[in-house]
């Protein structure tokens, strides 16, 4: 009797790793979108603060724009908390977001391919097991030999 041993090489760790990578990418995307929003708001506030230098009465200008000054300070602190000391351009942030979205899409596609392969391997394994069970039944109950 020939015995065939098949090795099914699907690695469930790969599926889990893909899930972890997708979660990491989602987190990074969320962070980058917050940074983008903060940077855009910071630029607007920064313009108001720079305009104070050319205002005829800087003290009155500052009191009229106190909200922008407070927002500027809080945005500056938040951006520093993200490790940003130099404000990146909008294009640079958007490119980073686009790259993350592309990487996430690619990872999702890879995960779907892994799942398809796993399904195929499961079917092959079931068929192989059924075939072995059929052969074992046939071997344990041999057909009676015909006599002449």
Segments from the language model and where they lie:
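Extended intrinsically disordered terminal tails
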Residues: 1-148
């Amino acid at each position: 009797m020939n015995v065939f041993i098949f090795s099914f090489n699907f690695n469930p760790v790969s599926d889990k790793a893909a899930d972890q990578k997708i979660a990491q990418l989602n987190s990074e995307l969320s962070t980058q979108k917050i940074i983008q929003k903060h940077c855009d708001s910071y630029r607007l506030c920064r313009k108001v603060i720079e305009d104070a230098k050319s205002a005829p009465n800087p003290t009155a200008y500052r009191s009229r724009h106190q909200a922008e000054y407070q927002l500027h300070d809080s945005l500056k602190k938040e951006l520093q908390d993200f490790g940003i000391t130099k404000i990146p351009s909008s294009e640079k942030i958007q490119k980073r977001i686009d790259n993350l979205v592309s990487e996430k899409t690619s990872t999702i596609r890879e995960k779907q391919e892994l799942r398809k392969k796993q399904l195929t391997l499961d079917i092959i394994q079931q068929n192989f097991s059924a075939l072995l069970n059929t052969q074992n039944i046939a071997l344990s109950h041999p057909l009676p030999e015909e006599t002449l």
